[in-house]
C-alpha cells in the first residue's frame, strides 16, 4: 500500500477528530477502539543486495460500533487506518483499510463503503497462520484483484454454519467522459463463501475486474494441537497484462505446544500461459511465543525463489527474496 507523509499536526488532528466522534457516538451506540502494532527487525536480501532494518507488518487502528434500532435491526460502522509502526507515517487514504456503514437483521447484512475483499479473507488470509499474512513473509503469490472502494455488498444470515457474501465495486466513471485514474468504466465483482463442519472449515472466493479474474478454494482442519490449511487458486492476467492463466497452491501447518507455536508455510505459483519463466516458490519457517492472549514475540525465515520473469516480493525480475526476522506483535 502506498503511503504519503503527513505532518504530526495533521495526523494528530485527524486522530483527535476520530476520537471525539467516537466519544460522542458512544452515548447512543456501542463503540470500540481496537488495533495492532506489529514490528520486526529483519535482514533482507534481494538478489545479492542486502539490508538490515526495522519493518512494519500491517499495523493498524480502528473504530467499530453498532446501534440497536429495535425490531431486530442494527446499524453498524467501521473505520480502520493503517500506519507504519517503524516510522509513524499514516496510510493514504487515511481509512483505506476500512470505511463502511452497514445495516443488519434477520435478512442478513447490507454493507456500503470500502473494505478488503471477503474473497481474500475466505481463502489466502485464512491459512496464513504465523504472522497474519503481513510483512515480508506475507503470501507473495496470491492474486488479489478486487477494487476495494465504492462497494455495495450483501451477506446472508448464517445457515447451518454456511455464509455467502457478494459485492460490487462501482467504477463511478461518468458516461461519455475519459477514464480517470481508478475509474476504467468497469465494475468489480467479488464473492466469498464460508462453511464449517466440526473441525473442518471450507471457503471459496471469486473476483472479476474487467479482464482480470481469480477463483480460489480453501480447506482448514484443526485437530488437537495440529492445524493444517491450504488453498488452490486460478487467476487470469493478475500479474501480467495478457499473461493468460496461472495456477497456484499453498499449504500451511502449525503445531501448538503451550505458549509456543511452530509454523511452516509453502506456496507454489505456476508460470502464466504467455509468460515463460514466471513461476515462483515461497516457503516460510516460523516460531511464535505467546506472552499473553494479545502479545507475542516471534521469528521467521522466509524465501521466494523467482523464475527469470518473476518478481514476487523482490520487485526485480529473476531476483530471489529472503528475510530473517524477529518481531513483536501487540493487539489492543
PLM regions with names:
Residues 47-50, 138-139, 176-179, 237-240, ...:
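Extracellular loop and loop/strand-boundary signature of outer-membrane beta-barrel proteins
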Residues 191, 289, 303, 319-332:
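Outer-membrane beta-barrel "beta-signal"
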Residues 28-43, 49-171, 185, 194-198:
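Outer membrane beta-barrel
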Residues 1-30:
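Cleavable N-terminal export/targeting peptides
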Residues 183-286, 302-303:
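Detector for outer-membrane/organellar transmembrane beta-barrel domains
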Residues 49-59, 95-97, 146-150, 185-189, ...:
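Residues that define the transmembrane beta-barrel architecture of outer-membrane proteins
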Residues 20, 64-68, 104-106, 155-158, ...:
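Structural signature of outer-membrane beta-barrel channels/translocons
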Residues 73-75, 107-111, 161-164, 199-204, ...:
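Repeated loop/turn-to-beta-strand initiation elements of outer-membrane beta-barrel proteins
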